[in-house]
């Protein structure tokens, strides 16, 4: 996916190649069993600008930060969903009450948008080794990026956003019932 992000509509790019020995790193894996999608969303809310135009979105953001906050300050790296525009829009819809928790979970797998490995400590950066680079030709990779993103959004709008299911849990219910990360319904 690095090549998809490297190339622009009219210009080639480069994808750098690295090696990283992770043995001595403390890694937060947001895909681990003790976490749910709301932990990832909370980290996203803390680190990206989120438009919270409605009272619901503002309240949802505050609730998630209070109840699903992960102390990642001592970690060297974090593994989790990519925070690209597609995922960001799915998360925005969830805190605005447009989609359910189930729909958010499903949306995160549309278009195979992938995971990211984020280095965040000096220790992690000191262990990374540059091994080379690969050309990302814009004629191939920019098109792939657009197709992947459009595919995810098309799947989202044609299936997930329009299909409410009986028993779906929305952010309002999570807040009203004061659900926490150990709630079985969020697993």
Language model region names:
Residues 2-11:
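Short active-site loop/helix that positions an aromatic residue
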Residues 13-19:
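A glycine-rich, hydrophobic loop/mini-helix early in the fold
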Residues 19-187:
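Active-site and NAD+-binding cores of ADP-ribose-processing enzymes
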């Amino acid at each position: 996916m690095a090549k998809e992000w490297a190339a622009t509509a009219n210009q080639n790019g480069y994808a750098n190649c690295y090696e990283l020995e992770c043995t001595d790193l403390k890694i937060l894996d947001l895909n681990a069993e003790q976490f749910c999608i709301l932990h990832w969303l909370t980290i996203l809310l803390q680190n990206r600008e989120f438009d919270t135009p409605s009272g619901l979105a503002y309240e949802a953001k505050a609730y998630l930060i209070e109840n699903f906050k992960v102390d990642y300050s001592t970690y060297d790296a974090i593994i989790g969903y990519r925070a690209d525009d597609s995922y960001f829009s799915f998360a925005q819809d969830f805190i605005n009450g447009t989609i359910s928790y189930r729909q958010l979970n499903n949306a995160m797998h549309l278009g195979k948008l992938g995971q990211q490995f984020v280095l965040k400590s000096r220790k992690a950066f000191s262990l990374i080794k540059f091994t080379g680079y690969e050309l990302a030709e814009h004629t191939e990779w920019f098109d792939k990026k657009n197709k992947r993103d459009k595919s995810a959004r098309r799947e989202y709008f044609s299936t997930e956003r329009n299909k409410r299911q009986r028993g779906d849990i929305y952010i309002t219910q999570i807040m009203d019932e004061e659900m926490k990360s150990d709630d079985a319904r969020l697993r």
